[in-house]
Amino acid sequence: MVSKKSRTVVREQKHRRLRNRFSGTAERPRLAVFRSNNHMYAQIIDDTVGKTLVSASTLDKEVKAELEKTNNVEAAAAVGTVVAKRALEKGIKTVVYDRGGFIYAGKIKALAEAAREAGLEF
């Protein structure tokens, strides 16, 4: 009997494969996105030194104050806007988008488009 892998296991395998293909540098850091059932998280990471330069999530007071729910497309867009604004304040203009093995649709796409509209290039 062949058992089917869970969605989480498949997503983690995809993410590992993607991470082998690219990494963030000081000139072009990585915008890593994680989606849980209740929240969205985004970090801009310099992989050469292993440090998070900028982060934002639906748990931040700045983001949470303007949201009714934290697990919808509007919340993801708000996180994208905030992470882009914080990155531009630190002088980060271009990033590599790491969708974390998630399908590029819905909340993942909304976060990316909001970050682009706010001024990040990827």
UniProtKB/Swiss-Prot annotation:
Keywords: Ribonucleoprotein, Ribosomal protein, RNA-binding, rRNA-binding. This is one of the proteins that bind and probably mediate the attachment of the 5S RNA into the large ribosomal subunit, where it forms part of the central protuberance. InterPro entries: Ribosomal_uL18_bac-type (IPR004389), Ribosomal_uL18_bac/euk (IPR005484). It comes from Lachnospira eligens (strain ATCC 27750 / DSM 3376 / VPI C15-48 / C15-B4) (Eubacterium eligens). The gene is rplR. One of its GO terms (cellular component) is cytosolic large ribosomal subunit. Pfam families: Ribosomal_L18p (PF00861). This is Large ribosomal subunit protein uL18. GO terms for molecular function: 5S rRNA binding; structural constituent of ribosome. Part of the 50S ribosomal subunit; part of the 5S rRNA/L5/L18/L25 subcomplex. Contacts the 5S and 23S rRNAs. HAMAP family: Ribosomal_uL18_B. Belongs to the universal ribosomal protein uL18 family. GO terms for biological process: translation. It comes from the Bacteria. The keyword Ribosomal protein applies.
